[in-house]
């Protein structure tokens, strides 16, 4: 049986680690370095090169050398923004709307997962050489804010590389495992993970080998590459102003600018100023042109102000979700090479009073954590327990376009949640389960993860069939949804493994937008709820009228039936109007009319059990004719009177109104 390793699959660099003699070890690659550039390229002979070899041909062969591939994984073409496709190589959409990367040398199109699998395969080969043994499985890390499709696509890349994924592990959680390994103290830890292409922040409670994730937040469109782009744009704009040439339109020049920007960024972590020198960057009618620019830390910080602002919000959201104050944080762990930027470190110090931990290598700590998790799985490490969470809320679309959340964000995983829903129309033979991910109350403003149809539901009035919908998230954060018709036992299941994915900008703004538009959302929801409640009441009233016709005949309760019919007409008249007050009045009138009809039903039941009751009913009817406006004030449709258990089969009960519109599909 082969060994298991831990892999940090990064946007910029990747690292592989393993447990040896009970301790995590980072494995050097075949070139002798401990980090492998996440770059894949092809030579003129169509030979594939990976890592440092691919990096060396970036400038001379930009169209056949591919980096930042992690930004494409698990995403469709229409979800990419201008920043993602601003690369020197060709990125396009195929006829299915999927991202494809073109190599002129091989004359082939590649899926991002296929190219990333080459990086994984190199890491595995180097590890097998070091260990002298085969490797058949791995723990692979992903950003905490990766969605379901991105996680599944990462898993698919590993399968293409020929290995099994035993666990998809969130990067901040892996870093916390590395930090807390062999520590017996209890600490509240904030992991600040700013990598090359993504940003995550997680809050954990670490105590005696138990790693309990409390909250996570992030931005999958923010990383060190964004800081590089600020420098690239500054250089390019100055050159454009001087020479009227935009270097960003030249693939080779753009690659040289990007490398120079990254170098300047790194140098400014230890120096106050640096020089950017790019001879023969391009040519004009007057001859070759060069770049010679002074660039200092103060200018870099002024260019990056907006990026620092974007780092603040996820930290604040994570603190709010965890219920902790900044003063309760005992340790701050910095992860990712971009946390070496002085202004980033200074920002962290303003957020949390404690000095950041300097005892871990930000480039290797995630791989070490992945190796520790691999040791837990293999049994080489014991007495360690990891409790992770799901980063975004998961639910489904219900009648009126509302989002019904089944699993809220920051719920510990693995988890299973279920609820019972019903049909929104009479004799409805099927229901569509539309799975959504996000924080907005309106389903259309959350991201669709997939949908499926449960058919074969026996004909029945609206609200009678019972459909059990269950959401299952495994330890990898991968989702499976099932729907079961309780009457027939018919079941339909779908694993969320592709299709629609979260747009990076949507993820970045999702929680913040939900908060900023909470008032607008409440108004929209109240309008939908009023309309749905009115439709439900009409359905109840029509069913009660049919019962009355069977019980009393056409004239037995004529006055009460006529009152209900007129009240239904009033509700139908105002249901699509923009005047909520008129609708509320008409609904109230229908409730009163139904109450009168129900009183007549109750009176008839008493007649059946007591012959003298008929005399009382006669006087009661006379009273109704003379004092028809004097109805009781009790609400016959009080939600508390109609509570029932929805989910007793699954060990949790609900006290909600059984006609609550959240439960119609």
Swiss-Prot record:
InterPro entries: ATPase_NBD, Chaperone_DnaK, Heat_shock_70_CS, HSP70_peptide-bd_sf, Hsp_70_fam. Induction: By stress conditions e.g. heat shock. Keywords: ATP-binding, Chaperone, Nucleotide-binding, Phosphoprotein, Stress response. Residues 642-651 have a biased composition (Low complexity). PANTHER family: HEAT SHOCK PROTEIN 70KDA. Acts as a chaperone. Belongs to the heat shock protein 70 family. This is Chaperone protein dnaK1.
């Amino acid at each position: 049986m082969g060994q298991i390793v831990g892999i940090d699959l990064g946007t910029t660099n990747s690292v592989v680690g393993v447990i040896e003699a009970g301790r995590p070890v980072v494995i050097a690659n075949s070139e002798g370095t401990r980090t492998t550039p996440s770059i894949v390229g092809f030579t003129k002979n169509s030979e594939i090169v990976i890592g440092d070899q691919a990096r060396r041909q970036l400038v001379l062969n930009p169209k056949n050398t591919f980096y930042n591939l992690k930004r494409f994984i698990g995403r469709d073409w229409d979800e990419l923004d201008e920043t993602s496709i601003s690369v020197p190589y060709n990125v396009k959409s195929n006829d299915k709307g999927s991202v494809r990367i073109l190599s002129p040398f091989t004359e082939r199109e590649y899926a991002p997962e296929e190219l990333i699998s080459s990086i994984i395969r190199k890491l595995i080969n180097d590890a097998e050489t070091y260990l002298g043994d085969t490797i058949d499985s791995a723990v692979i890390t992903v950003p905490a804010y990766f969605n379901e499709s991105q996680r599944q696509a990462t898993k698919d890349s590993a399968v293409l590389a020929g290995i099994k994924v035993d666990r998809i592990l969130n990067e901040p959680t892996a870093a916390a495992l590395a930090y807390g390994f062999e520590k017996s103290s209890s600490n509240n830890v904030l992991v600040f993970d700013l990598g090359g292409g993504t940003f995550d922040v997680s809050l954990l409670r670490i105590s005696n080998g138990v790693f309990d994730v409390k909250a996570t937040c992030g931005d999958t469109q923010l990383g060190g590459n964004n800081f590089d782009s600020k420098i690239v744009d500054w250089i390019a704009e100055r050159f454009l102003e001087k020479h009227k040439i935009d270097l960003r339109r030249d693939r080779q020049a753009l690659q040289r600018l990007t490398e120079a920007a990254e170098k300047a960024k790194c140098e400014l972590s230890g120096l106050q100023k640096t020089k950017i020198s790019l001879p023969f960057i391009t040519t004009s009618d007057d001859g070759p042109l060069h770049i010679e620019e002074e660039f200092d830390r103060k200018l870099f910080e002024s260019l990056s102000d907006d990026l620092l602002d974007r780092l603040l919000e996820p930290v604040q959201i994570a603190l709010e979700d965890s219920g902790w104050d900044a003063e309760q944080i005992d340790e701050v762990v910095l992860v990712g090479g971009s946390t070496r930027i002085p202004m980033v470190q200074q920002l962290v110090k303003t957020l949390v009073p404690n000095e950041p931990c300097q005892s871990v290598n930000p480039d290797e700590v995630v791989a070490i954590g992945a190796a520790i998790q691999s040791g837990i799985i293999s049994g080489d490490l014991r007495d360690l327990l990891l409790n992770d969470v799901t980063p975004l809320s998961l639910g489904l679309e219900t009648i009126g376009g509302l989002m019904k959340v089944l699993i809220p964000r920051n719920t510990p995983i693995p988890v299973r949640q279920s609820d019972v829903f019903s049909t929104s129309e009479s004799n409805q033979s099927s229901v569509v389960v539309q799975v959504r991910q996000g924080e907005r109350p309106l389903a259309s403003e959350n991201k669709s993860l997939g949908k499926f149809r449960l058919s074969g539901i026996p004909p029945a009035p609206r609200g009678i069939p019972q459909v059990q919908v269950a959401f299952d998230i495994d330890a990898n954060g991968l989702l499976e949804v099932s729907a079961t018709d309780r009457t027939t036992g018919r079941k339909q299941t779908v694993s969320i493994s592709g299709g629609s994915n979260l747009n990076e900008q949507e993820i970045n703004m999702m929680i913040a937008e939900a908060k900023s538009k909470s008032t607008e959302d409440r108004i929209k929801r109240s309008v939908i709820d009023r309309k749905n409640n009115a439709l439900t009441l009409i359905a109840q009233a029509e069913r009660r009228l049919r019962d009355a016709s069977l019980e009393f005949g056409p004239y037995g309760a004529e006055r009460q039936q006529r009152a209900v019919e007129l009240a239904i007409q009033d509700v139908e008249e105002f249901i699509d109007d923009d005047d909520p007050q008129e609708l509320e009045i008409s609904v109230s009138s229908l409730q009163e009319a139904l109450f009168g009809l129900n009183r007549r039903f109750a009176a008839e039941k008493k007649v059946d059990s007591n012959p003298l009751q008929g005399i009382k009913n006669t006087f009661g009817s006379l009273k109704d004719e003379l004092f028809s406006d004097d109805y009781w004030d009790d609400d016959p449709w009080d939600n508390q009177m109609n509570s029932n258990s929805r989910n007793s089969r699954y060990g949790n009960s609900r006290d909600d109104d059984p006609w609550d519109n959240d439960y119609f599909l």
